[in-house]
Amino acid sequence: MNKPNVLLFDIDNTLLDFSAGAMQAMEEIFRAAGLPYAPEMFAVFQVENDKLWARIERGELTIAGLRDVRWQTILARLGLEADGAAMEDAFRDRLHESAVPVAGAPEVLARLHGKYRLCAASNGPYAQQVNRLRRAGMLDAFERLFISGQMGAEKPSRVFFDRCLAQLPGVRPEQCLMIGDSLTADIAGGRAVGMRTCWFDPADRGAAMPPQADWQIGRAHV
């Protein structure tokens, strides 16, 4: 089998450190709302946010639906009262400006640029993801951006990946390598349409390579 020549990168926690940006945004919106904040509260955000994204990946929830319930759910878990919709808006405004690269990611893109066709494939609002890539100095590395907010479908749906391929005329699925940290959205989603896959383990847990991935890398190998 020939080596893939089109690389599709997930964005959050693959190229950009979503967790770092979200933690900073959470602290800022709590301070602005006059709510108590402690770093350990971020663990509640992570658990509840991951649950909601898992529902999106299973097709049970839309990104718009996530916005409606995310902060309402998190505040309830923390025993705090505030306007969940206003907190969501404030959180997204701050996240829009967040551009903390995953360690080594800019250098990897620089090495690959010109040798492969690089694309981004991400769930999220289009303007937000474009702005974050621009602020991180990564935007110009990409030939195409496949962002769910503009694609009208989310990973891991076949519709999302089929629409990616439709915008790459003449490219067969097996010529594409989907790289990302989500075994569901990135690895299972890419594999389902015939793409080859590379699981990025951002925590460097040293876990065994999942059977649905063709390759595995961690931060130490970026």
Locate predicted features:
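Asp-based, Mg2+/Mn2+-dependent phosphohydrolase catalytic module
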Residues: 1-7, 20, 31, 36, ...
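Catalytic-core regions built around general acid/base machinery
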Residues: 104-115
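Glycine-centered short loops/turns at secondary-structure junctions
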Residues: 115-116, 194
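Short, conserved clusters of charged catalytic residues that mark active-site
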Residues: 103-104, 159
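N-terminal helical cap/lid subdomain that shapes the substrate entry/recognition surface
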Residues: 2-103
